[in-house]
Regions:
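Gly/Pro/Ser/Thr-rich low-complexity, intrinsically disordered segments predominantly at protein N-termini
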Residues: 1-215
C-alpha cells in the first residue's frame, strides 16, 4: 500500500500585535513561521489559538485533501499559519485554515505566503471566528476569485460549500442525498460530510480507500 503521511502542526502562543499601522511588506518582516496574525488594510489582527475540536477537524481535512492532491498529482495543500495575500484592491493578508493551489497556479506560492487567490480555501470556524468567516472573509474571497470556499463548523456539525459562478458570485452547493459533496477544483475529490463529525475522526487511510484513491 502507498505510504500515507499524517498531518501534524504545532500551535504557538500568539504574539502581541505591534503598535501602529504597517505595510504588507513590514507585516511579513515582523512575523515569522509561528505567527498567527492577519493583515487587514494596514492593521495587524492577532488570531485566537484553535481549540481541540477545531484542530482535529482541520488536520483531518487537510490530511485528506493533501494526500488526494499528492496521489492524483493535482497541486499543493497548505495549512495555517500560511498567509494569503488577496489581490488588489483588497488590502488583506489572511491566514485560512487550509488552502489548495493547483499545479497550473503553483507559481503563486512564495516562501512565506500565497500571492493571490488560491483555488480553494477552507475555514474551520470557532465561536470567535464564525461571524468573520461567514461575513468579511466570504465577501473578500468571493471578490478575490477563490473558486471554492468551504465553511466547516464543528460545534454545529454544519458544513457549507460555495462555488464561484460565471457571474463571479458565490452560489451554495449542497451535499447530495447521500451526504456527499463533490469538488470541482480537485477533480475526482468527494467528501462524505459525516466524516467530519465522527468521534473519533476516521483515519485518512480508510477514507482514501473508500474514495478509491488507494487499495
Amino acid at each position: 500500500m502507498d505510504e500515507v503521511r499524517e498531518a501534524t502542526v504545532q500551535y504557538e502562543i500568539p504574539r502581541a500585535a505591534p503598535a501602529g499601522r504597517m505595510s504588507f511588506e513590514e507585516f511579513l518582516a515582523w512575523g515569522d513561521e509561528d505567527t498567527w496574525a492577519e493583515w487587514v488594510d494596514g492593521d495587524v489582527v492577532v488570531l485566537t489559538p484553535a481549540n481541540l475540536k477545531h484542530q482535529d477537524v482541520s488536520l483531518f481535512l487537510a490530511g485528506l485533501l493533501s494526500e488526494f492532491a499528492v496521489f492524483r498529482k493535482l497541486g499543493k495543500v497548505m495549512i495555517a499559519p500560511f498567509l494569503v495575500r488577496l489581490p488588489e484592491p483588497l488590502r488583506r493578508g489572511r491566514e485560512p485554515d487550509i488552502l489548495y493551489i493547483s499545479n497550473e497556479r503553483v507559481s503563486l506560492l512564495k516562501e512565506t505566503y500565497c500571492d493571490g487567490a488560491p483555488d480553494l480555501i477552507v475555514e474551520v470556524t470557532s465561536p470567535e471566528s464564525l461571524a468573520r468567516d461567514r461575513g468579511e472573509k466570504y465577501v473578500e474571497y468571493e471578490a478575490a476569485g477563490v473558486r471554492e470556499y468551504w465553511l466547516v463548523d464543528p460545534d454545529r456539525r454544519q458544513a457549507e460549500f460555495y462555488r464561484l459562478g460565471e457571474n463571479r458570485r458565490y452560489r451554495s452547493v449542497p451535499a447530495d442525498e447521500r451526504g456527499v459533496f463533490k469538488s470541482e477544483v480537485l477533480p475526482g475529490f468527494w467528501l462524505k460530510v459525516d466524516w467530519l463529525w465522527e468521534e473519533p475522526l476516521p483515519s485518512v487511510v480508510v477514507c482514501l480507500k473508500e474514495m478509491g484513491v488507494i487499495q
